[in-house]
Every structure is written in C-alpha cells, then in structure tokens.
C-alpha cells in the first residue's frame, strides 16, 4: 500500500519525537527550576504561547497529512469499467432514494421535524461558549471564539481531543441560527444511518433478505444514546461516529475487495478520528489489531500466517492493519506534546479521575454484542465459522465500552456510548441477515421473515422504552430542562421589569450555574447582579452598582435558581429569609425565583 522506506522513516521520526518528549517531561519539567512558576504571569504567558505554537504546527501537519492521503486515494482509485458505465450518478440516487425507500424517507422527514422543533440555545456548555453572540444581534458569529479553543486545545488537564467541537465552531461562522445547526445534525445522523446500512449490506454478502436500511434506521435512530447526542450540539461523538461509519465501510470493502484507494481512505478517517475523543483511537486501531492477530495465527482465510521465512508476504498482506496500529504512535506523540507536557507544567490532576471504574450500566444491545463476540470467537477458533470484518468491529466496540468503563464509567444510554451503540446496531442487522439467510434455506418465506425482522426491531425499541433511560424519556427530559431554563429566565425578566416600573431596587442573586458566564443574565433589568459562591459562602457584585465589591443580602433581593437545583440545599444555603414567588414545577428542583423578605 505504501512505500516501506517511507513507513520506516516516519516511524523513526515518531519514535524519536516520543523519546524527546519523555525526556523533556521527566528530565526538565519535573525539576522545572529554570521555568517561571505556573501561578505567575510569566508562567501563564509561557503556557499559553506553548499551547498556541504546538497546536498551530499540529493543525498544519494534520492538514498536510490528510491532503496527502486524499491524493494517494485518488491516484489509486480502482474502478471497474462495467460499474462506471452502469452505476447511477450520486444525484440520480438521491432523487430516486425516497421513491425506493418511502418509509425510510418519511421516517427521516418526521425525525428531522422533531429535531428542529427541539433546537435551542440552552445546552449546558453552549451558554458559555456563545455568551456574547446574542449581545451582537446575531451579527458577530463569524469570529474565532476563545471559549472553543480553551475547551479543547488549552485544557491542560491531561485530556486530549484537540478537534472536538471545532465542527460546531466552524458551523457557527456560517450561520448563528440553531435551527440550521440542527438540520446539519440531522444530515450527519442520516448519513451515518445510510453508510451503516451500506456496510451491513457488504458484511451480509448474499444474504440481503431484510430491508436493511429500514431496520438500521429503526434500531439506531430510536436509541437513547442517539437522542442524547444528536438532539444537542455539544457532544463530539456525532463526528466520531460519522467518521467511524465511513471507516467501517471502507475497511469492509478493503477486507473483501483489497482496493488500495479504500485503504488510504480508511487510514484518513482513522487519523482524523484520533483527535475528536481521547478514547476514540480504540475504535480505529482495535479492529486492525484484531485482524492482525487473527490472521497471523491462521484464523483468516486467504491471509498468511506470521512465519519467519515469509515476513515480506506478511507485511504486504497486513499493510493497512500495520498502518492503522501505527496511528497509536502518532497519537502518543501528539498527546505528549499537546497535552502531557503542558498539563505536567500546569500541575493539575487528570480530569474526572474520580469517575474511573465508577459504574457499568449495559443494555440488551451491549449484551448481544458481548455474546456475539464470545460465541463467534469460539466458533472461528474451532474452524466452524469464517472470520469476518464484523468480528473485528465487534471487538473494537466492546473494547471501547470497557475503555469508557475504566476512564469515566459506562452507561449505555449516555452520549459517550454512541460508538458502541453504532457497532451494536451494525451487529444486530448483520446477524438478522445471516439468520434469515439460514432460515430461508429451511423453507421459511423470505417476505414473512423480512416483515418479522422489522417487527422485531420495533419490539426491541418497545422493550427499551419500558425503562426510564430510553429514547423518549431522554428527549422529554432534555426538552423539559431547556423549557424550564428559558421560561425561568423570561419570568425573571418580566418580574424585574415590573419591579422597575414600581420604582424598586433590583438586586438579583444567582449561584453555581451554567449561566455563570452571565451572557444571558446581563440582559435582565437590575441594579446589581450578584454571584454567591457556594464554596466560599461569599457574595460578589458581578455587574451593576458597586461592580467587583462584596455584598450583603437585604430585604427585597431576588434569588434566581435557573439550573442550580438542589445544590443550594446541599451546600447548606439558608433559605429561611426567602419566599418563593414563582415556580416552574414543584416536581423539579430548579426553575424557581425567590424574594428575600427579611
């Protein structure tokens, strides 16, 4: 696939850089006597300049690498002359797709309407990331936002996902309207579904007896993790799974057809996928490692074993897998220079280290995935089943789930589980095809089996909805949270306007909240906007009269609880001087406005 001399050169450079980074970390930064203290102004400037310079070179090298891989893929594109003459154009396929798949087209349309109706500015981190965009009358969206850069490239807490959220960053330059952003979310989601269905067709071989696209759509669109991720904007798993779907498709084609262009496109998606999630490398390297090990011990037909006298043949046969495994070296070098060194200098603890091995909440899909891995592994080792690319993907999905469990815990309904749910959905659809192909040989009617498969998919969704962590409850919970935030904010605006008309002094107290960056709160009417620090138990005037000074609460002050919830009670905040004057719902701990009466 690639020149072996070039591979050796790149590997040597990578390992050399890694060695230099390790020496720098343990031999220079740990004593760090010649460096300014991190808590000094000079130390902060040094850290910021280092992050800026290192990430600038990283982005330039990544762009060059992606361009090089795209060029190689284009040069090596192998097309069958018969396919070129008979294959429909992309536009023709798009135009005729609703006619060929009317149920899926209707499902996509209805799903998009629900997504757009759900669109809102009120998504946790977005309130801080775009705190000033409303103040500019939605006209200053085309600008670099420090909040996005700081969130990903300047964290200095040993986390590593430099490209996360940058798709949203770039999208916001084109339009500031969240309804348009949600349409892009829908396009990404449906692209994943279509590519996933195409991959399932390739993996199924001749057993394409079920409506694959419809089955895949039902299973993936109505999973709780899908709703959690795509009905919001703030989670990078959207792009990770989009890249993963493309990776699975080209890797399957490469595994079956051995086209060189597919190998380069696999490597391209794997390279980009490394930098959107710190655990994402498992999704792109574990399948390759699985194929490498399985083939080397003779479990894959038409792939050579690892023998001393045929090492060159082995290298040629597993060139893609070796390159994908080599991405670990690329990731390690980038992590050392972009995250480990600055984090070590900053002297902070690893983010969310207290969540390691904290919880493991599987669902039926994950159990089916684990059972498939176990059964097929035994049967492949016994020679009863042929190794498939699906086996590699399943191992990758399970490894990713265990990796999440080790890092931050695993919950199947959480947005972080989306890559696992994609692998699980692919596994279920392919297994259904294989099962129907087997039943068809036993004389069972194919049409009946196809309808039964779709009904079974709907039945699985129904079973999942018997729990509280399903798709519908997840979407409803998000909608209620967003509505409580915006309704409470609007109500506070009305109350403050009326207080102004009455000639009253307006002092608004708020506490720990996603609204702490004040972009939305500063638009309220007030004399003073006051922040109460729950940890220090101090009041500080953030805006208005006496800005920056301490404050002593007095009668008539407003206490605003948009999303603080139970934390006021948990931190022992004395609520006795306050009277509730508005409540979004007595069933929720947030969405409340109080007024001090003492």
Predicted features along the sequence, with ranges:
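Transmembrane-helix signature of polytopic, membrane-embedded enzymes
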Residues: 197-223, 241-242
């Amino acid at each position: 696939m690639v020149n072996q001399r070039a591979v050796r050169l790149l590997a040597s450079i990578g390992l050399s850089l890694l060695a230099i980074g390790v020496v720098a970390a343990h031999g220079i930064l740990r004593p760090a006597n010649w460096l300014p203290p991190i808590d000094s102004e000079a130390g902060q400037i040094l850290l910021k300049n280092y992050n800026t310079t290192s990430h600038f070179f990283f982005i330039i090298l990544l762009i060059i690498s992606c361009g090089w891989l795209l060029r190689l893929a284009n040069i090596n594109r192998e097309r069958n002359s018969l396919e070129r003459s008979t294959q429909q154009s992309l536009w023709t396929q798009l135009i005729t797709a609703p006619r060929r798949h009317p149920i899926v087209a209707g499902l996509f349309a209805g799903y998009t309407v629900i997504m757009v109706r759900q669109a809102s500015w009120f998504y946790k981190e977005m309130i801080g990331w775009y705190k000033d965009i409303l103040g500019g009358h939605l006209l200053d969206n085309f600008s670099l936002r420090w909040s996005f850069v700081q969130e990903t490239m300047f964290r200095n807490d040993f986390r590593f996902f430099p490209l996360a959220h940058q798709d949203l960053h770039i999208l916001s330059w084109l339009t500031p309207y969240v309804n348009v952003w949600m349409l892009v979310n829908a396009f990404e989601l449906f692209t994943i579904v279509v590519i996933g269905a195409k991959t399932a067709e390739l993996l199924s071989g001749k057993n394409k007896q079920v409506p694959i696209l419809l089955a895949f759509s039902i299973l993936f669109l109505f999973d709780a993790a899908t709703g959690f991720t795509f009905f919001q904007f703030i989670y990078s798993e959207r792009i990770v799974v989009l890249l993963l779907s493309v990776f699975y498709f080209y890797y399957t084609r490469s595994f079956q057809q051995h086209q060189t262009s597919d190998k380069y496109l696999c490597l391209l998606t794997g390279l980009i996928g490394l930098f959107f999630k710190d655990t994402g490398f498992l999704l792109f390297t574990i399948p390759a490692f699985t194929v490498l090990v399985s083939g080397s011990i003779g479990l894959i037909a038409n792939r050579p074993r690892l023998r001393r006298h045929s090492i060159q043949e082995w290298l040629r046969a597993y060139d893609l897998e070796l390159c994908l495994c080599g991405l670990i070296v690329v990731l390690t070098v980038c992590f050392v220079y972009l995250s480990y060194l600055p984090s070590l200098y900053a002297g902070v603890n690893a983010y969310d280290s207290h969540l390691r091995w904290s919880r493991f909440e599987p669902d039926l899909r994950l159990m089916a995935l684990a059972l498939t891995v176990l059964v097929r592994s035994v049967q492949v080792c016994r020679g009863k089943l042929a190794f498939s690319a699906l086996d590699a993907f399943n191992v990758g999905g399970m490894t990713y789930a265990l990796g999440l469990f080790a890092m931050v815990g695993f919950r199947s309904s959480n947005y972080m589980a989306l890559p696992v749910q994609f692998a699980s959905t692919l596994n279920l659809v392919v297994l259904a095809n294989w099962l129907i192909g087997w039943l068809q040989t036993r004389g069972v009617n194919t049409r009946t089996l196809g309808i039964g498969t779709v009904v079974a998919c709907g039945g699985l969704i129904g079973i999942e909805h018997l729990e509280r962590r399903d798709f519908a409850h997840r979407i409803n919970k998000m909608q209620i949270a967003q509505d409580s935030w915006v309704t409470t904010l609007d109500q506070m605006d009305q109350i403050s306007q009326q207080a102004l008309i009455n000639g009253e002094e307006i002092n608004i107290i708020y506490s720990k909240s996603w609204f702490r960056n004040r972009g939305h709160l500063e638009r309220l009417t007030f004399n003073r906007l006051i922040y109460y620090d729950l940890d220090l138990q101090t009041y500080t005037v953030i805006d208005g009269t006496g800005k920056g000074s301490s404050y002593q609460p007095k009668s008539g002050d407003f206490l605003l609880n948009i999303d603080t919830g139970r934390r006021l009670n948990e931190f022992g905040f004395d609520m006795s001087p306050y009277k509730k004057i508005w409540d979004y719902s007595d069933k929720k701990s947030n969405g409340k406005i109080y007024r001090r009466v003492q």
